A protein has these predicted regions:
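Alpha-helical transmembrane segments of multi-pass small-molecule/ion transporters
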Residues: 1-305
Length: 305
């Protein structure tokens, strides 16, 4: 299956679930307060379990070198993303925290996993886990403090000891020591972790119900953030890592992951911190639509280099 078809399929699936969430909100089935409670379930239970369960897989020493390269390249990419977002998005802007967060963090799981699997198979997915691991560490430290607009030590400790960050390190220990959960417990936790994508889409759809679509489309910063997230960042990052002696597949996996649309985590953080979840939903929705054009283009450019 071609990259374009895989991307289009994932976007359609995502928007169908999002529309269900929007309908539930319009009909009063999900209230504003209810959506806040759902976001807590997603952030503090479902997402950590998804991270932990991703490490319940077979260890392969043959692929360890590629995985280490993926960690390094992913770290460079995130470093570039954070630096550029800080430089290009002024702190004087009233919603700079939402814009910076949306510019850095991508939907690398739901879009990235099926896309990478369709192009590079299971080996590509293994390399993607490095990017997703760093995503979860950074989104719960840098991302958390960016959205909360707090840099104090107490906030850092709270972010660094969040369930998702703990899940990363516990999952890595289980993976390296090849500790497997009993079948019944594994199946039970897998069912809960599988809720991550539909639950996140329902939350985003419910938040989108509060959005003035016509007003949103007139916001030039929405397009600027999307252009940065979908095209500028991945190209700049790829140019920086292009000459490193890493396997080409690893470079492409990191490129595609960084070029995925805006993460839904921003909407859930915005709900928790009483920011503007509607604006985050706008970033998510528009970037997801535009990624149907930009992702194939970025992928082709990467393959040509």
């Amino acid at each position: 299956m071609g990259a374009g078809v895989v991307i289009l399929k994932q976007i359609v699936i995502m928007f169908i679930i999002l529309l269900i969430g929007l309908w539930c909100s319009l009909k009063g089935l999900i209230t504003k307060e209810g959506n806040k409670q759902l976001s807590k379930v997603a952030l503090y239970i479902v997402n950590p379990l998804l991270i932990f369960m991703s490490y319940q897989s077979e260890y392969s020493s043959k692929l360890l070198k590629g995985l280490m390269w993926s960690f390094l390249l992913s770290g460079i990419t995130f470093g570039v993303a954070i630096a550029l977002s800080t430089l290009l998005i002024s702190k004087k802007r009233p919603e700079h925290s939402l814009e910076r967060f949306s510019a850095v963090y991508s939907n690398c799981g739901f879009i990235g996993i099926p896309l990478i699997r369709g192009i590079y198979g299971d080996e590509g997915v293994l390399y993607l886990t490095a990017y997703i691991t760093l995503f979860n560490i950074l989104v719960w430290t840098h991302g958390y403090m960016t959205m909360k607009e707090s840099r104090d030590f107490k906030s850092f400790i709270k972010a660094a000891t969040s369930p998702s960050v703990i899940a990363v390190f516990v999952g890595l220990i289980f993976y390296l020591m090849q500790i497997r959960l009993p079948e019944i417990l594994h199946t039970s936790l897998q069912y809960v972790s599988d809720m991550n994508t539909p639950l996140a889409m329902l939350i985003a759809g419910s938040a989108a119900a509060q959005t003035n679509v016509l007003k949103a489309l007139k916001n030039k910063w929405l397009y600027m953030v999307c252009a940065y997230k979908l095209f500028l960042l991945p190209i700049v990052a790829f140019a920086l890592v292009h000459f490193l002696p890493a396997p080409h597949m690893v470079k492409m996996v990191v490129l595609i992951a960084s070029a995925c649309p805006v993460a839904t985590t921003g909407t859930m953080f915005a709900i928790q911190f009483d920011k503007n979840p509607e604006r985050c939903s706008e970033f998510f929705a528009v970037s997801t639509l535009l990624s149907g054009l930009t992702l194939p283009l970025v992928t082709m450019l990467g393959e040509m280099l």
